[in-house]
Amino acid sequence: KITTIIVTHDSYEAFYLGHKCAIILDGQIKQFDDPYNVYHFPNSVEVVNFLNRGILIPAKVTGENSLENDDLGTINGNFIKHYPKGSNVQLLLQPEDLEHDDKSNLKLEVVDRKFRGTNFIYTLKTSSDLLIPVFVHSHHEHQHEADEKFGIKRPIHIDHIVCF
């Protein structure tokens, strides 16, 4: 075994190469963990912003395993940190958290679509002008263009809900 320290500003590179990752901001270690946990369980808004792998949207805790967002409705899942019912939080929404469904009644406007090989990343706009990134497998036959409506599967379920 050889211990190696790699310094990079590319989180994909860090996740791919590292057994452990340290997020260092302003000379302080903000999070030190394995890459999976750094990505799925960031411990602060600073880490979320540094990774730039999702957005924070306003939500209200409505139950032990649910919260509500004005644009997306009810979101169910498993909270990483529990908050009292009625708490206003910032929900981390990552591109893989929402699923596309052409038949859904929850429709968002397509602002942009980028091809990334195995998937497309769509940028969707909500009724309150939030811009939400969503991954869709590139084999999906119906590709949406800008200004088209894009269905989001309901109920929305996120395996691990991260809030601040």
Residue positions per predicted region:
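Internal alpha/beta loop-helix hairpins
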Residues: 2-73
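Non-catalytic connector elements of ABC transporters
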Residues: 54, 64-164
